[in-house]
Protein backbone atom coordinates (compact mmCIF):
# COMPACT_ATOMS: atom_id res chain seq x y z
CA UNK A 1 0.00 0.00 0.00
CA UNK A 2 1.24 3.47 -0.86
CA UNK A 3 1.82 5.40 2.36
CA UNK A 4 0.03 8.58 1.31
CA UNK A 5 0.01 11.59 3.63
CA UNK A 6 -3.01 13.44 2.21
CA UNK A 7 -5.47 12.03 4.76
CA UNK A 8 -3.29 12.35 7.87
CA UNK A 9 -5.31 14.16 10.60
CA UNK A 10 -8.21 14.78 8.19
CA UNK A 11 -11.78 14.42 9.48
CA UNK A 12 -13.42 11.74 7.33
CA UNK A 13 -17.02 10.50 7.40
CA UNK A 14 -17.70 7.01 6.02
CA UNK A 15 -21.40 6.87 5.16
CA UNK A 16 -22.87 3.37 4.98
CA UNK A 17 -20.99 0.25 5.94
CA UNK A 18 -21.22 -3.13 4.19
CA UNK A 19 -17.86 -4.58 3.18
CA UNK A 20 -16.60 -1.59 1.21
CA UNK A 21 -17.40 0.83 4.05
CA UNK A 22 -15.60 -1.31 6.63
CA UNK A 23 -12.56 -1.51 4.36
CA UNK A 24 -12.53 2.25 3.68
CA UNK A 25 -12.88 3.12 7.37
CA UNK A 26 -10.10 0.72 8.41
CA UNK A 27 -7.67 1.99 5.77
CA UNK A 28 -8.41 5.65 6.51
CA UNK A 29 -7.74 4.93 10.18
CA UNK A 30 -4.37 3.38 9.24
CA UNK A 31 -3.57 6.46 7.15
CA UNK A 32 -3.99 8.65 10.22
CA UNK A 33 -7.41 10.14 9.49
CA UNK A 34 -9.95 10.93 12.22
CA UNK A 35 -12.69 8.58 11.04
CA UNK A 36 -16.40 8.60 11.89
CA UNK A 37 -18.64 5.85 10.54
CA UNK A 38 -22.39 6.32 10.14
CA UNK A 39 -24.70 3.42 9.31
CA UNK A 40 -28.49 3.04 9.46
CA UNK A 41 -28.44 -0.43 10.99
CA UNK A 42 -28.74 -0.34 14.82
CA UNK A 43 -25.46 -0.89 16.67
CA UNK A 44 -26.76 -4.01 18.45
CA UNK A 45 -27.40 -5.67 15.05
CA UNK A 46 -24.22 -4.35 13.45
CA UNK A 47 -21.14 -6.55 14.03
CA UNK A 48 -19.18 -4.56 11.44
CA UNK A 49 -19.71 -1.34 13.41
CA UNK A 50 -18.81 -3.09 16.65
CA UNK A 51 -15.53 -4.26 15.11
CA UNK A 52 -14.66 -0.73 13.98
CA UNK A 53 -15.40 0.67 17.44
CA UNK A 54 -12.87 -1.78 18.88
CA UNK A 55 -10.26 -0.27 16.52
CA UNK A 56 -10.90 3.16 18.01
CA UNK A 57 -13.08 4.44 15.18
CA UNK A 58 -16.07 6.61 16.12
CA UNK A 59 -19.34 4.88 15.22
CA UNK A 60 -22.86 6.36 14.94
CA UNK A 61 -25.59 3.84 14.13
CA UNK A 62 -29.36 3.61 13.77
CA UNK A 63 -30.00 6.60 11.47
CA UNK A 64 -28.31 9.18 9.26
CA UNK A 65 -28.51 12.37 11.42
CA UNK A 66 -28.06 15.26 9.03
CA UNK A 67 -26.61 17.49 11.77
CA UNK A 68 -23.60 15.16 11.82
CA UNK A 69 -22.30 17.08 8.80
CA UNK A 70 -21.91 20.20 10.96
CA UNK A 71 -18.89 18.62 12.68
CA UNK A 72 -16.35 19.91 10.15
CA UNK A 73 -15.72 16.85 7.99
CA UNK A 74 -13.25 17.35 5.14
CA UNK A 75 -14.24 14.26 3.15
CA UNK A 76 -17.22 11.88 2.81
CA UNK A 77 -16.75 8.32 1.53
CA UNK A 78 -20.19 7.00 0.67
CA UNK A 79 -21.45 3.50 0.08
CA UNK A 80 -22.11 3.26 -3.69
CA UNK A 81 -25.72 2.20 -3.05
CA UNK A 82 -26.56 5.54 -1.39
CA UNK A 83 -27.93 7.82 -4.14
CA UNK A 84 -26.83 11.40 -4.63
CA UNK A 85 -30.31 12.69 -3.77
CA UNK A 86 -29.92 11.32 -0.24
CA UNK A 87 -30.28 14.31 2.17
CA UNK A 88 -26.88 13.61 3.75
CA UNK A 89 -25.14 13.64 0.37
CA UNK A 90 -27.04 16.71 -0.81
CA UNK A 91 -26.02 18.61 2.33
CA UNK A 92 -22.38 17.48 2.06
CA UNK A 93 -22.19 18.74 -1.51
CA UNK A 94 -23.90 22.00 -0.53
CA UNK A 95 -21.22 22.44 2.16
CA UNK A 96 -18.60 21.77 -0.55
CA UNK A 97 -17.36 18.64 1.24
CA UNK A 98 -15.84 16.27 -1.36
CA UNK A 99 -17.86 13.04 -1.74
CA UNK A 100 -16.09 9.98 -3.13
CA UNK A 101 -16.64 6.22 -3.30
CA UNK A 102 -14.29 3.56 -2.00
CA UNK A 103 -12.77 2.80 -5.44
CA UNK A 104 -11.23 6.29 -5.47
CA UNK A 105 -9.42 5.43 -2.24
CA UNK A 106 -8.37 2.08 -3.74
CA UNK A 107 -6.69 3.84 -6.66
CA UNK A 108 -4.90 6.30 -4.40
CA UNK A 109 -3.28 3.58 -2.26
CA UNK A 110 -2.70 0.91 -4.92
CA UNK A 111 0.81 0.01 -6.01
CA UNK A 112 -0.68 -2.24 -8.71
CA UNK A 113 -2.07 -0.92 -12.02
CA UNK A 114 -5.82 -1.39 -12.45
CA UNK A 115 -7.81 -3.04 -15.22
CA UNK A 116 -11.27 -1.52 -14.72
CA UNK A 117 -14.36 -3.15 -16.23
CA UNK A 118 -17.80 -1.55 -16.47
CA UNK A 119 -20.93 -1.83 -18.62
CA UNK A 120 -24.61 -2.66 -18.22
CA UNK A 121 -24.21 -6.39 -18.84
CA UNK A 122 -21.25 -8.75 -18.72
CA UNK A 123 -19.12 -6.95 -16.11
CA UNK A 124 -18.72 -9.89 -13.76
CA UNK A 125 -18.06 -12.46 -16.48
CA UNK A 126 -15.58 -10.24 -18.33
CA UNK A 127 -13.74 -9.33 -15.13
CA UNK A 128 -13.49 -13.00 -14.17
CA UNK A 129 -12.24 -14.11 -17.61
CA UNK A 130 -9.57 -11.38 -17.62
CA UNK A 131 -8.53 -12.41 -14.11
CA UNK A 132 -8.14 -16.06 -15.19
CA UNK A 133 -6.23 -15.16 -18.37
CA UNK A 134 -3.72 -13.00 -16.50
CA UNK A 135 -3.21 -15.68 -13.84
CA UNK A 136 -2.78 -18.37 -16.50
CA UNK A 137 -0.02 -16.22 -18.02
CA UNK A 138 1.66 -15.64 -14.65
CA UNK A 139 0.49 -17.13 -11.37
CA UNK A 140 -1.01 -14.63 -8.90
CA UNK A 141 -0.52 -11.72 -11.33
CA UNK A 142 -4.19 -10.67 -11.06
CA UNK A 143 -6.29 -9.86 -8.01
CA UNK A 144 -10.09 -9.75 -8.28
CA UNK A 145 -11.83 -6.69 -6.84
CA UNK A 146 -14.66 -4.17 -6.89
CA UNK A 147 -18.33 -4.81 -7.41
CA UNK A 148 -17.63 -8.54 -7.69
CA UNK A 149 -17.56 -9.03 -3.92
CA UNK A 150 -14.06 -8.07 -2.80
CA UNK A 151 -13.74 -4.45 -1.60
CA UNK A 152 -11.45 -2.60 -3.98
CA UNK A 153 -9.58 -0.80 -1.21
CA UNK A 154 -8.95 -4.02 0.73
CA UNK A 155 -7.47 -5.65 -2.38
CA UNK A 156 -5.45 -2.52 -3.22
CA UNK A 157 -4.02 -2.43 0.29
CA UNK A 158 -2.15 -5.69 -0.32
CA UNK A 159 -1.47 -5.45 -4.08
CA UNK A 160 2.10 -5.12 -5.35
CA UNK A 161 3.51 -3.31 -8.37
CA UNK A 162 4.08 -6.58 -10.31
CA UNK A 163 0.37 -7.48 -10.12
CA UNK A 164 -2.82 -6.17 -11.76
CA UNK A 165 -6.13 -5.54 -10.05
CA UNK A 166 -9.01 -6.77 -12.23
CA UNK A 167 -11.75 -4.51 -10.90
CA UNK A 168 -15.47 -4.69 -11.69
CA UNK A 169 -17.03 -1.23 -11.46
CA UNK A 170 -20.67 -0.13 -11.32
CA UNK A 171 -22.03 3.25 -12.37
CA UNK A 172 -22.71 3.87 -8.66
CA UNK A 173 -19.01 3.51 -7.88
CA UNK A 174 -17.80 5.48 -10.90
CA UNK A 175 -19.95 8.52 -10.11
CA UNK A 176 -17.76 9.10 -7.05
CA UNK A 177 -14.30 9.14 -8.62
CA UNK A 178 -12.00 12.15 -9.01
CA UNK A 179 -8.45 10.93 -9.71
CA UNK A 180 -9.19 7.23 -10.38
CA UNK A 181 -7.25 6.06 -13.44
CA UNK A 182 -7.14 2.47 -14.67
CA UNK A 183 -4.28 1.51 -16.98
CA UNK A 184 -6.88 -0.35 -19.06
CA UNK A 185 -10.58 0.55 -19.06
CA UNK A 186 -13.23 -1.76 -20.50
CA UNK A 187 -16.83 -0.79 -21.36
CA UNK A 188 -18.71 -3.95 -22.34
CA UNK A 189 -21.96 -2.25 -23.46
CA UNK A 190 -24.52 0.32 -22.34
CA UNK A 191 -28.28 -0.25 -22.17
CA UNK A 192 -31.12 1.22 -20.09
CA UNK A 193 -30.47 0.50 -16.41
CA UNK A 194 -30.59 1.92 -12.89
CA UNK A 195 -32.83 4.84 -13.83
CA UNK A 196 -34.21 4.62 -10.28
CA UNK A 197 -30.74 5.74 -9.10
CA UNK A 198 -29.61 8.07 -11.90
CA UNK A 199 -31.70 11.10 -12.83
CA UNK A 200 -31.79 10.07 -16.50
CA UNK A 201 -30.00 7.97 -19.12
CA UNK A 202 -27.49 10.72 -19.85
CA UNK A 203 -26.30 10.72 -16.23
CA UNK A 204 -26.02 6.93 -16.32
CA UNK A 205 -23.91 6.98 -19.51
CA UNK A 206 -21.69 9.74 -18.12
CA UNK A 207 -21.13 7.73 -14.93
CA UNK A 208 -19.92 4.79 -17.02
CA UNK A 209 -17.77 7.13 -19.13
CA UNK A 210 -16.03 8.35 -15.96
CA UNK A 211 -13.96 5.17 -16.10
CA UNK A 212 -11.67 6.77 -18.70
CA UNK A 213 -11.79 10.43 -17.67
CA UNK A 214 -8.26 10.51 -16.21
CA UNK A 215 -6.61 8.18 -18.71
CA UNK A 216 -3.70 9.45 -20.79
CA UNK A 217 -1.96 8.39 -24.02
CA UNK A 218 -0.14 5.51 -22.28
CA UNK A 219 -3.45 3.95 -21.20
CA UNK A 220 -5.98 1.84 -23.12
CA UNK A 221 -9.76 1.89 -23.57
CA UNK A 222 -11.37 -1.38 -24.73
CA UNK A 223 -14.84 -0.59 -26.03
CA UNK A 224 -17.83 -2.14 -27.81
CA UNK A 225 -17.66 -0.97 -31.44
CA UNK A 226 -21.14 -2.36 -32.19
CA UNK A 227 -22.74 0.42 -30.13
CA UNK A 228 -22.75 3.70 -32.03
CA UNK A 229 -23.16 5.68 -28.81
CA UNK A 230 -19.91 4.28 -27.40
CA UNK A 231 -18.10 4.57 -30.72
CA UNK A 232 -18.92 8.29 -30.85
CA UNK A 233 -17.77 8.85 -27.27
CA UNK A 234 -14.26 7.60 -28.10
CA UNK A 235 -13.57 10.93 -29.83
CA UNK A 236 -13.38 12.42 -26.33
CA UNK A 237 -10.80 10.07 -24.79
CA UNK A 238 -7.03 10.51 -24.50
CA UNK A 239 -6.49 6.75 -24.13
CA UNK A 240 -5.55 4.40 -26.96
CA UNK A 241 -8.82 2.89 -28.21
CA UNK A 242 -9.04 -0.88 -28.75
CA UNK A 243 -12.40 -1.80 -30.33
CA UNK A 244 -14.17 -5.16 -30.21
CA UNK A 245 -17.13 -6.31 -32.30
CA UNK A 246 -19.28 -9.41 -32.62
CA UNK A 247 -20.65 -8.29 -36.01
CA UNK A 248 -17.86 -6.47 -37.88
CA UNK A 249 -14.51 -7.63 -39.27
CA UNK A 250 -12.50 -4.76 -37.87
CA UNK A 251 -8.92 -5.60 -38.85
CA UNK A 252 -7.91 -4.14 -35.49
CA UNK A 253 -8.92 -4.92 -31.94
CA UNK A 254 -10.83 -8.17 -31.37
CA UNK A 255 -13.52 -9.59 -33.63
CA UNK A 256 -14.72 -12.80 -35.34
CA UNK A 257 -13.73 -13.85 -38.85
CA UNK A 258 -14.33 -17.19 -40.61
CA UNK A 259 -15.24 -18.83 -37.31
CA UNK A 260 -12.08 -17.62 -35.59
CA UNK A 261 -11.49 -15.22 -32.71
CA UNK A 262 -9.16 -12.54 -34.10
CA UNK A 263 -6.99 -9.79 -32.65
CA UNK A 264 -5.30 -7.28 -34.98
CA UNK A 265 -5.55 -9.72 -37.94
CA UNK A 266 -4.05 -12.57 -35.88
CA UNK A 267 -5.99 -15.81 -35.32
CA UNK A 268 -6.33 -16.46 -31.58
CA UNK A 269 -8.39 -19.66 -31.82
CA UNK A 270 -11.66 -21.18 -33.03
CA UNK A 271 -14.90 -19.69 -31.77
CA UNK A 272 -16.52 -23.14 -31.53
CA UNK A 273 -13.97 -24.14 -28.89
CA UNK A 274 -15.29 -21.54 -26.43
CA UNK A 275 -17.25 -23.22 -23.64
CA UNK A 276 -19.47 -20.21 -22.82
CA UNK A 277 -22.60 -20.05 -25.01
CA UNK A 278 -24.30 -17.03 -26.54
CA UNK A 279 -23.71 -13.73 -28.34
CA UNK A 280 -23.69 -11.85 -25.03
CA UNK A 281 -20.83 -14.03 -23.83
CA UNK A 282 -19.02 -13.50 -27.14
CA UNK A 283 -18.90 -9.78 -26.26
CA UNK A 284 -17.36 -10.68 -22.92
CA UNK A 285 -14.83 -12.98 -24.59
CA UNK A 286 -13.75 -10.41 -27.18
CA UNK A 287 -13.31 -7.68 -24.56
CA UNK A 288 -11.23 -10.08 -22.45
CA UNK A 289 -9.07 -11.10 -25.41
CA UNK A 290 -8.31 -7.43 -26.14
CA UNK A 291 -7.09 -6.89 -22.57
CA UNK A 292 -5.13 -10.15 -22.46
CA UNK A 293 -3.31 -9.51 -25.75
CA UNK A 294 -2.50 -5.94 -24.68
CA UNK A 295 -0.87 -7.33 -21.52
CA UNK A 296 1.14 -10.04 -23.28
CA UNK A 297 -0.93 -13.17 -22.67
CA UNK A 298 -0.22 -15.81 -25.33
CA UNK A 299 -2.85 -17.24 -27.68
CA UNK A 300 -2.44 -20.69 -26.10
CA UNK A 301 -3.03 -19.25 -22.61
CA UNK A 302 -6.07 -17.31 -23.82
CA UNK A 303 -7.63 -20.36 -25.47
CA UNK A 304 -6.92 -22.57 -22.45
CA UNK A 305 -9.13 -20.25 -20.38
CA UNK A 306 -11.85 -19.98 -23.04
CA UNK A 307 -11.95 -23.76 -23.55
CA UNK A 308 -12.27 -24.51 -19.81
CA UNK A 309 -14.07 -21.52 -18.23
CA UNK A 310 -17.57 -22.67 -17.27
CA UNK A 311 -18.86 -19.20 -16.47
CA UNK A 312 -19.50 -17.24 -13.32
CA UNK A 313 -21.81 -19.04 -10.91
CA UNK A 314 -25.51 -18.60 -11.76
CA UNK A 315 -24.80 -16.69 -15.03
CA UNK A 316 -25.39 -19.17 -17.89
CA UNK A 317 -23.00 -21.37 -15.92
CA UNK A 318 -22.20 -24.76 -17.44
CA UNK A 319 -22.90 -27.29 -14.70
CA UNK A 320 -22.35 -30.75 -16.19
CA UNK A 321 -22.77 -32.89 -19.31
CA UNK A 322 -24.49 -36.15 -18.41
CA UNK A 323 -26.41 -38.74 -20.42
CA UNK A 324 -25.80 -36.57 -23.51
CA UNK A 325 -27.55 -33.58 -21.94
CA UNK A 326 -25.84 -30.30 -21.01
CA UNK A 327 -27.14 -28.60 -17.85
CA UNK A 328 -26.81 -24.81 -17.46
CA UNK A 329 -27.53 -22.65 -14.40
CA UNK A 330 -28.70 -19.13 -15.27
CA UNK A 331 -30.43 -18.36 -11.96
CA UNK A 332 -29.11 -14.77 -12.21
CA UNK A 333 -31.67 -14.26 -15.03
CA UNK A 334 -34.08 -12.34 -12.80
CA UNK A 335 -35.74 -10.50 -15.71
CA UNK A 336 -37.09 -11.25 -19.18
CA UNK A 337 -34.17 -9.63 -21.04
CA UNK A 338 -31.67 -11.93 -19.32
CA UNK A 339 -33.63 -15.05 -20.29
CA UNK A 340 -33.93 -13.79 -23.87
CA UNK A 341 -30.12 -13.44 -23.98
CA UNK A 342 -29.64 -16.94 -22.58
CA UNK A 343 -32.03 -18.55 -25.07
CA UNK A 344 -30.32 -16.79 -27.99
CA UNK A 345 -27.11 -18.57 -27.01
CA UNK A 346 -28.25 -22.12 -27.79
CA UNK A 347 -28.76 -23.82 -31.16
CA UNK A 348 -29.73 -27.24 -29.76
CA UNK A 349 -33.22 -28.01 -28.40
CA UNK A 350 -33.78 -26.48 -24.96
CA UNK A 351 -35.76 -27.72 -21.97
CA UNK A 352 -36.39 -24.45 -20.13
CA UNK A 353 -37.02 -24.13 -16.39
CA UNK A 354 -38.62 -20.76 -15.58
CA UNK A 355 -40.73 -18.92 -13.02
CA UNK A 356 -40.56 -16.99 -9.78
CA UNK A 357 -41.71 -13.73 -8.23
CA UNK A 358 -44.65 -12.02 -9.97
CA UNK A 359 -43.81 -8.38 -10.73
CA UNK A 360 -46.72 -7.88 -13.10
CA UNK A 361 -45.00 -8.86 -16.38
CA UNK A 362 -46.98 -10.67 -19.07
CA UNK A 363 -43.92 -12.54 -20.49
CA UNK A 364 -45.21 -12.16 -24.06
CA UNK A 365 -41.74 -10.81 -24.93
CA UNK A 366 -40.40 -14.36 -24.51
CA UNK A 367 -42.52 -15.72 -27.37
CA UNK A 368 -40.06 -14.95 -30.24
CA UNK A 369 -37.25 -16.60 -28.24
CA UNK A 370 -39.07 -19.91 -27.75
CA UNK A 371 -38.14 -21.25 -31.22
CA UNK A 372 -35.61 -23.75 -29.82
CA UNK A 373 -37.56 -24.51 -26.63
CA UNK A 374 -39.03 -28.02 -26.91
CA UNK A 375 -40.38 -28.26 -23.35
CA UNK A 376 -41.19 -25.64 -20.72
CA UNK A 377 -41.22 -26.44 -17.00
CA UNK A 378 -42.67 -23.66 -14.83
CA UNK A 379 -42.86 -23.00 -11.10
CA UNK A 380 -43.43 -20.17 -8.63
CA UNK A 381 -45.90 -17.27 -8.69
CA UNK A 382 -45.50 -16.73 -12.45
CA UNK A 383 -46.00 -20.38 -13.47
CA UNK A 384 -49.40 -19.76 -15.08
CA UNK A 385 -48.27 -16.60 -16.91
CA UNK A 386 -45.14 -18.16 -18.41
CA UNK A 387 -47.00 -21.41 -19.08
CA UNK A 388 -49.62 -19.47 -21.07
CA UNK A 389 -46.89 -18.07 -23.36
CA UNK A 390 -45.46 -21.56 -23.80
CA UNK A 391 -48.84 -22.89 -24.88
CA UNK A 392 -49.24 -20.05 -27.40
CA UNK A 393 -45.86 -21.13 -28.83
CA UNK A 394 -47.12 -24.71 -29.08
CA UNK A 395 -44.64 -25.97 -26.48
CA UNK A 396 -45.39 -28.79 -24.06
CA UNK A 397 -45.71 -27.20 -20.59
CA UNK A 398 -45.24 -28.91 -17.21
CA UNK A 399 -46.18 -27.30 -13.88
CA UNK A 400 -44.11 -28.16 -10.80
CA UNK A 401 -43.78 -26.83 -7.26
CA UNK A 402 -40.19 -25.56 -7.36
CA UNK A 403 -36.76 -25.81 -8.99
CA UNK A 404 -35.92 -29.05 -7.20
CA UNK A 405 -39.05 -30.71 -8.59
CA UNK A 406 -38.32 -29.35 -12.08
CA UNK A 407 -34.97 -31.14 -12.51
CA UNK A 408 -36.19 -34.78 -12.72
CA UNK A 409 -39.03 -33.70 -15.03
CA UNK A 410 -36.51 -31.91 -17.26
CA UNK A 411 -34.41 -35.07 -17.47
CA UNK A 412 -37.45 -37.22 -18.27
CA UNK A 413 -38.63 -34.86 -21.02
CA UNK A 414 -35.18 -34.38 -22.60
CA UNK A 415 -33.07 -36.45 -24.98
CA UNK A 416 -29.34 -36.73 -25.71
CA UNK A 417 -28.16 -33.53 -27.41
CA UNK A 418 -30.62 -31.33 -25.51
CA UNK A 419 -29.83 -28.35 -23.30
CA UNK A 420 -31.45 -28.24 -19.85
CA UNK A 421 -31.49 -24.58 -18.83
CA UNK A 422 -32.59 -22.89 -15.61
CA UNK A 423 -33.24 -19.29 -16.69
CA UNK A 424 -36.21 -18.13 -14.59
CA UNK A 425 -36.91 -14.65 -16.07
CA UNK A 426 -38.02 -13.72 -12.54
CA UNK A 427 -36.61 -12.80 -9.16
CA UNK A 428 -36.39 -15.66 -6.67
CA UNK A 429 -38.01 -14.12 -3.59
CA UNK A 430 -41.34 -15.94 -3.79
CA UNK A 431 -39.58 -19.22 -2.92
CA UNK A 432 -35.85 -18.58 -2.43
CA UNK A 433 -34.01 -15.95 -0.42
CA UNK A 434 -31.63 -15.06 -3.28
CA UNK A 435 -30.94 -16.09 -6.86
CA UNK A 436 -27.79 -17.81 -5.53
CA UNK A 437 -29.86 -20.00 -3.20
CA UNK A 438 -32.13 -20.88 -6.14
CA UNK A 439 -29.16 -21.71 -8.37
CA UNK A 440 -27.57 -23.86 -5.69
CA UNK A 441 -30.87 -25.71 -5.21
CA UNK A 442 -30.86 -26.43 -8.96
CA UNK A 443 -27.29 -27.73 -8.95
CA UNK A 444 -27.92 -29.84 -5.84
CA UNK A 445 -30.99 -31.35 -7.52
CA UNK A 446 -28.88 -32.25 -10.58
CA UNK A 447 -26.39 -34.01 -8.31
CA UNK A 448 -29.18 -35.93 -6.59
CA UNK A 449 -30.69 -36.91 -9.95
CA UNK A 450 -27.37 -38.29 -11.22
CA UNK A 451 -26.83 -40.21 -7.99
CA UNK A 452 -30.35 -41.68 -8.14
CA UNK A 453 -30.16 -42.75 -11.79
CA UNK A 454 -26.68 -44.26 -11.47
CA UNK A 455 -27.49 -46.32 -8.34
Swiss-Prot record:
Pathway: Cell wall biogenesis; peptidoglycan biosynthesis. The keyword Transcription does not apply. One of its GO terms (molecular function) is UDP-N-acetylmuramoylalanine-D-glutamate ligase activity. SUPFAM superfamilies: MurCD N-terminal domain, MurD-like peptide ligases, catalytic domain, MurD-like peptide ligases, peptide-binding domain. One of its GO terms (biological process) is regulation of cell shape. Keywords: ATP-binding, Cell cycle, Cell division, Cell shape, Cell wall biogenesis/degradation, Cytoplasm, Ligase, Nucleotide-binding, Peptidoglycan synthesis. Its EC number is 6.3.2.9. The keyword Cell division applies. It is an enzyme of class 6 (ligase). It is found in: Cytoplasm. Pfam families: Mur_ligase_C, Mur_ligase_M, MurD-like_N. Transmembrane segments: none annotated. ATP binds at residues 119-125. InterPro entries: Folylpolyglutamate_synth_CS, Mur-like_cat_sf, Mur_ligase_C, Mur_ligase_C_dom_sf, Mur_ligase_cen, MurD. Coiled coil: none annotated. GO terms for cellular component: cytoplasm. It catalyses: UDP-N-acetyl-alpha-D-muramoyl-L-alanine + D-glutamate + ATP = UDP-N-acetyl-alpha-D-muramoyl-L-alanyl-D-glutamate + ADP + phosphate + H(+). PANTHER family: UDP-N-ACETYLMURAMOYLALANINE--D-GLUTAMATE LIGASE (PTHR43692:SF1). Belongs to the MurCDEF family. Cell wall formation. Catalyzes the addition of glutamate to the nucleotide precursor UDP-N-acetylmuramoyl-L-alanine (UMA). This is UDP-N-acetylmuramoylalanine--D-glutamate ligase.
Amino acid sequence: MKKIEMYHHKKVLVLGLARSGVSAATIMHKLGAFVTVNDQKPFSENPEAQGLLEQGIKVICGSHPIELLDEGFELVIKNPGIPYNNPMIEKALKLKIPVITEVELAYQISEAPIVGITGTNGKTTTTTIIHHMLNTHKENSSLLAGNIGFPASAVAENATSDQYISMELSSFQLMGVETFKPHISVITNIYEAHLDYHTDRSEYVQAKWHIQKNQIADDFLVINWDQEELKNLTKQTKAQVIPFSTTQRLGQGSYVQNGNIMFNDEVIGERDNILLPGEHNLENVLASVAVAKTLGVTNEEIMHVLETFKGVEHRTQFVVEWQGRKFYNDSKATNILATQSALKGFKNPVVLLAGGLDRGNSFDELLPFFKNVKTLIVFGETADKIGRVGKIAGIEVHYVDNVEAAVPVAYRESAPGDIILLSPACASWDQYRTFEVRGNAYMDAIGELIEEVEK
